[in-house]
């Protein structure tokens, strides 16, 4: 799987107009923005998180702290997609390594946006290791910020959902699969979000649990397939720029030559195997979301702006938790209810032999799938 560093020069005035007023320090010192992957590229048999941090940098290339939240906020996500609410459904987040400040940072995020507290003490939040015990893995600062991104997005899209965080010991697919099985075996879990990916491979049984929506990011390197999004029974989640405007150029997509075509995917994919994506949500780091994490990665912590399909996967998992149409394989319900999605018809993520795999258009396309949520009628 290819990984790339994306550097975009965006005027501070444009950034402020898109995401709220910049701090005085940003307005004075910052000249550009830098988008960078926070997790190391995956080795064989392992995955990397699909989070891209959007840092404002000064003329020396040093990140300028966000003193207040910047990026899309919970109210923006709820309004754009018709989400919000919830009734105690549990969304599980599977990631690698430990974020030691996950619960405290979640508290800061939810308090900032006037969301009800979600804590271990009140039964809303639970963190455990990959086998369901209190033994947690070692800290990894990149994955720690991925974890905060994931739990913040569930909080934004489904503020009354409970959150189960299962931390795999390492980023190997063997350990991540163990964590997914642990999440699936936990009573009350209705959706499991996986904001990571590695090279396309055959489906692992851990990602096949009827009655649970298992979502996965399609990747952040443009056209090309990643697992577990390529697995037939996983809902592959692509990405857009903004909420419904255009396909994001970094979203993964394609046609698997390894995994079989799910029965519910139609001829529109022009693919004899599993085609990515199924659906999509905001992912472009230049139209990113607000996240809070106090575990510093490369010297950066606090209020952050993130993009990548790591953003879109937990949003879609939350949509399934809210919609509740989980019988059998939830993706099948989505493919049968496309009128409840907003079609994305412009943009592309690269060059491909079959245009629908990499270019957005009317109906299904690779970068954005069937579209973005328009309420929860497709979920």
Predicted regions and their residues:
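Secretory targeting and sorting signals
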Residues: 1-27
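N-terminal hydrophobic or amphipathic segments with adjacent small-residue motifs
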Residues: 7, 213, 232, 302, ...
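Substrate-binding/charge-relay-adjacent region of secreted/lumenal peptidase catalytic domains
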Residues: 25-237, 257-307, 313, 317, ...
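Short, surface-exposed amphipathic charged segments that create phosphate/polyanion-binding patches used
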Residues: 180-181, 249-251, 359
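Ligand-binding/active-site lining segments
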Residues: 240
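Phosphate/diphosphate-binding glycine-rich loops and adjacent basic-rich segments that engage nucleotide
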Residues: 244-255
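An often Trp-containing, charged/polar helix-loop segment at the C-terminal end
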Residues: 317-320, 324-370
């Amino acid at each position: 799987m290819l990984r790339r560093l994306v550097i975009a020069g965006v005027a501070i005035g444009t950034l402020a107009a898109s995401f709220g007023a910049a701090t005085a320090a940003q307005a004075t010192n910052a000249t550009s923005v830098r988008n960078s992957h926070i997790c190391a590229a995956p080795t064989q048999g392992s995955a990397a998180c699909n989070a891209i941090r959007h840092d404002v940098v000064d003329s020396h290339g040093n990140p300028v702290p966000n003193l207040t939240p910047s990026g899309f906020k919970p109210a923006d996500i709820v309004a754009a997609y018709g989400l919000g609410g919830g009734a105690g459904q549990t969304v599980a987040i599977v990631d690698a390594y430990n974020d030691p400040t996950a619960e405290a940072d979640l508290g800061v995020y939810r308090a900032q946006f006037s969301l009800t507290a979600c804590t271990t003490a009140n039964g809303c939040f639970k963190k455990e290791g990959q086998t369901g015990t209190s033994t947690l893995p070692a800290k990894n600062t990149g994955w720690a910020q991925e974890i905060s991104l994931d739990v913040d997005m569930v909080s934004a899209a489904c503020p009354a959902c409970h959150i189960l965080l299962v931390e795999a010991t390492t980023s190997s697919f063997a350990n991540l699969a163990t964590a997914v099985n642990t999440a699936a075996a936990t009573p009350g879990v209705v959706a499991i979000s996986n904001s990571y990916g590695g090279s396309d491979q055959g489906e692992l049984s851990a990602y096949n649990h009827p009655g649970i929506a298992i979502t996965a990011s399609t990747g952040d390197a443009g056209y090309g397939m990643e697992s577990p999004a390529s697995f037939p029974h996983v809902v592959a989640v692509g990405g857009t720029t903004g909420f419904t405007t255009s396909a994001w150029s970094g979203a993964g997509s394609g046609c698997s030559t390894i995994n079989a075509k799910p029965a519910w995917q139609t001829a529109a994919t022009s693919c004899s195997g599993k085609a990515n994506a199924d659906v999509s949500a905001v992912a472009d780091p230049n139209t990113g979301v607000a996240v809070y994490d106090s575990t510093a990665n490369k010297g950066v912590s606090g209020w952050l702006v993130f993009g990548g399909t790591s953003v879109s996967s937990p949003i879609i998992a939350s949509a399934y938790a809210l919609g509740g149409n989980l019988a059998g394989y939830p993706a099948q319900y989505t493919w049968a209810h496309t009128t409840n999605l907003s079609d994305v018809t412009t943009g592309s993520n690269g060059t491909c032999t079959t245009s629908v795999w990499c270019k957005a258009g009317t109906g299904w396309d690779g970068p954005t799938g069937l579209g973005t949520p328009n309420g929860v009628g497709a979920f």
